[in-house]
Amino acid sequence: MRGSVFGFVPSFRIRFFASSTHIIDTMKTLQEYLSASHAPEDLGKIIMMIADQAGPIRSAFISNQNYAGSTNSSGEDQAEMDTWADTRITSVLQESGLVRSIASEEQEDITEMSPSAKYSVVMDPLDGSSLIKVNLTVGTIVGIYEGDVLQAGNKLRAAFYMLYGPLTTLTISLGNGVSIFAMNEEGTYVLLKENVRIPEGTLCGSGGLRPEWTEKHIQYMNAIECEGGKNRYSGSFVADFHQILEYGGVYAYPATKKSASGKLRLVFEINPIGFLAVQAGGAVSNGESSTLEIVPTKVHQRTPVYVGSKGMIAKIEAIR
């Protein structure tokens, strides 16, 4: 049997998957999960509104595979899908009246929306968008704060990402563990796995060109390779992290000789993913201490990142 062309999973396949692997005992939708978690009503609505954009975003891949001829605030070329997904999600949140402000990797500044609203959203609308042309996995990364945008990652009320691969999945935490859902053929997110934990593993993926690595990072990667570490790096942060979440190991985008701040953005990428990692029993660090404790001073602030199994993160912090 096959899923639909958009990567949805027929509900009968999910039931078989759940019963045959004993991952879950009963079926639960994302909406039911939010209710059972006692998520505040407005927070739950914001999560569902963004989650519901996965189908339209994935459907738009076919007709939006080129570059848009523009750059984002970080100076990176924008793919058509970057701007399409950003506009789509921003418009939905603007119309809802439930969001105070939004910060997106594809927007130069924080966009103010409804001043009386309780929550603010940070997002990378389409992480890894350059991989769409070669049909590799990409995703949408989201964090939600109570109050304003520029807060430490440990203040997040919710973090999740949608992954557009063979399945369309949503991995989420409200601060009480991590759960993974998959979209079925009806567009409903059904629970695949709950209480997800990052095992100690040997997968490793590192960004940056090797000649530009610092001595500290070279020492770290050499040690991993000597211990049998297996390299996994696709160019999509969210896809590479999902492998680490499942199998254990570390994803790194370190400080380099050219950029002491690394490449990834603290607000849109590192904080939501780091929050999920910690909720799954893992850790996140800039190589010295937790990135979740950093209070950003600007929306496009960058920082080096190591995220994954606790043991892997302890090793990089131990190198002086």
From Swiss-Prot:
This is Fructose-1,6-bisphosphatase class 1. Keywords: Carbohydrate metabolism, Cytoplasm, Hydrolase, Magnesium, Metal-binding. Its main location: cytoplasm. It catalyses: beta-D-fructose 1,6-bisphosphate + H2O = beta-D-fructose 6-phosphate + phosphate. It is found in: Cytoplasm. One of its GO terms (biological process) is fructose metabolic process. Substrate binds at residues 127-130, 233, 263. Binds 2 magnesium ions per subunit. Its cofactor is Mg(2+). Mg(2+) 1 binds at residues 105, 124, 126. Homotetramer. One of its GO terms (cellular component) is cytoplasm.
